Design a protein with these regions (language model features):
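Short, Lys/Arg-rich N-terminal segment immediately upstream of the first membrane anchor
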Residues: 1-4
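Hydrophobic membrane-insertion alpha-helices, especially the h-region
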Residues: 6-23
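Generic detector of bulky aromatic hydrophobic side chains
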Residues: 7-8, 58-59, 168
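Residues in flexible loops and secondary-structure boundaries
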Residues: 9, 68-70, 191, 195
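N-terminal export/targeting and maturation segments
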Residues: 20-99
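Extracytoplasmic electrostatic interaction patches
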Residues: 98-201
Length: 201
């Protein structure tokens, strides 16, 4: 085999490696963008409910988007952890076992949020409404008014327990809300082992 032929073959090999690598990179970016779009709407829904239905909250923040298991393209194991601060310097994680071992809901895919790609590669994002029906929202960049929750019985129960246990002070459900609350959204993506969730603070 001549040097010229070897050079051509090597160039072709490098070209194919770059093309394949570029495709994997673009596919990964597409998946990450879907996560960010879906969780942006989901975090807005959670924060809006707390802001409009609870007084005494000074700040609401969210963990990164934690993804665990699968091959990086699975939407099964992903979640965020909302954190609530009262006006007395206390904060409470909406996460089971942190610090109370009670039934705190999971905030993630198939627990209020559905993510996928529709036929043709377009985004597929659904959020739950008050009737516990999944509603398509991928056409929105911000939470539509019709998906502002008016009730969330499980969250209400958890926050009631947090109040009784002294984890949060002065956080009460009412129509006054917390109009001046600081909200810190978080669309950073972290791929982790599920067992490492408790390490985030």
């Amino acid at each position: 085999m001549s040097k010229r032929t070897k050079s051509i073959l090597l160039s072709l090999l490098c070209f194919f490696v770059l093309v394949i690598g570029g495709k994997f990179y673009m596919d990964g970016m597409k998946v990450d963008n879907l996560y960010r779009h879906g969780y942006q709407l989901f975090e807005e829904q959670i924060a809006t409910y707390l802001k409009e239905h609870y007084s005494g909250i000074s700040k609401i923040e969210f963990s990164p988007i934690f993804i665990s298991g699968g091959d990086g393209e699975s939407f099964v194991h992903s979640r965020v952890i909302p954190v609530i601060y009262d006006n007395y310097g206390n904060k409470a994680y909406l996460q089971n076992g942190r610090p109370l071992d009670i039934g705190v809901p999971r905030y993630g895919t198939f627990a209020g949020l559905q993510l996928d790609f529709a036929y043709g590669g377009s985004e597929f994002i659904h959020l739950l409404n008050d009737e516990k029906e999944y509603i398509q929202v991928d056409q929105y960049q911000h939470l539509p008014p019709e998906l502002k929750l008016k009730k969330d019985d499980i969250m209400d129960e958890v926050l009631s327990i947090y109040g009784k246990e002294g984890l949060l002070k002065g956080v009460e459900k009412n129509d006054q809300g917390s109009p001046q609350v600081e909200i810190v959204y978080n669309l950073e993506i972290q791929r982790i082992d599920e067992r490492d969730l408790d390490k985030w603070k």
